[in-house]
Amino acid sequence: KNPVQYEGHLTFGQIAEALLSSTKTEKRQLNALRAPYHIFGDDITEEAKTQLYTALKLPISVGGALMPDAHSGYGLPIGGVLAVENAVIPYGVGLDIGCRMCLSILDIPVSYLSGARDKYEKALMEHTKFGMYEHHKSHVDHEIFDRDTFSLIPILKRLKDKAIKQMGTSGSGNHFVEFGEVELLADDPQIGLPKGKYLGILSHSGSRGFGAEIAQYYVRVAAEQCPLPKEAQQFAWLDLSTHLGLEYWTAMNLAGDYASACHDDIHRRLIRAVGGRLRARIE
């Protein structure tokens, strides 16, 4: 009787929004003035600045910044920050949702790295997987796959098997896994380790094909729901008070957690292969 109260509901929101008269397909206009911003650095290209300036004219924008190393990217500049109100921009979040780095510090003396180099190289060759189609022969039962979220959203249900298959893999591009020396220049009470040198595992990767397909789907959905002038089309957003906005936000967070789970699996396999115990992890 009152679809408005269900508009942002994860299960019934899509039906409610279909029942409501909607103006979501009307082309949105950019503001004449930019939202407040700050630029940190002197050698940032005009292209990167222009990308931020366009984003700052979105009706949802409340502020932005460019970091000293900012440069032009896909949509938003790399090293750019954009704050928006009650909305999310799928293309701004990016195609590799949750891409991150993860460092594990082990209790193995760092001298072992050079003394048994072949052992560590062999562990990397046998227990890491790179490329679009590489995967492990065995898969760990991770708690993330027990989450109800996979059954609540159709695209997540469809992608679950892919996510399981790609668990613990790194993909391609600039992603990597390596052993190396970690030096703490002072005692670090936050991670509970004293000053010294340690053996570490460092990895860089994201949410694999699982996150990429989520991103591609909702980028298309946002473009349909939020038409924008040509120069700003990549900034199409989803309102977080709507079903679609909530749906993407939920899927995005699951993809981020999946990326973290992949790092955990990669490090677990390597620690099991070389021995030792985990002393600290930074992600």
Segments from the language model and where they lie:
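Short, flexible loop/turn elements at secondary-structure junctions
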Residues: 43, 69-71, 180-183, 205-207
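Glycine-rich, flexible loop motifs
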Residues: 5-63, 87, 91-92, 97-191, ...
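Short glycine-rich or small-residue beta-strand-to-loop segments that form or flank ligand, phosphate
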Residues: 65-66, 200-204
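Gly/lys/ser-thr-rich phosphate-binding loops in alpha/beta enzymes
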Residues: 76, 88-90, 208
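Active-site nucleophile and cofactor-binding loops and adjacent substrate-binding regions
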Residues: 67-73, 94-95
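Glycine-rich loop at the start of a catalytic domain that most often binds anionic cofactors/ligands
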Residues: 77-85
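Short, low-complexity S/T/E/D/G/P-rich linear segments that nucleate or cap local secondary structure
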Residues: 1-2
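Short acidic, Gly/Ser-rich segments with clustered Asp/Glu that frequently serve as metal-coordination loops
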Residues: 72-73, 100, 206-211
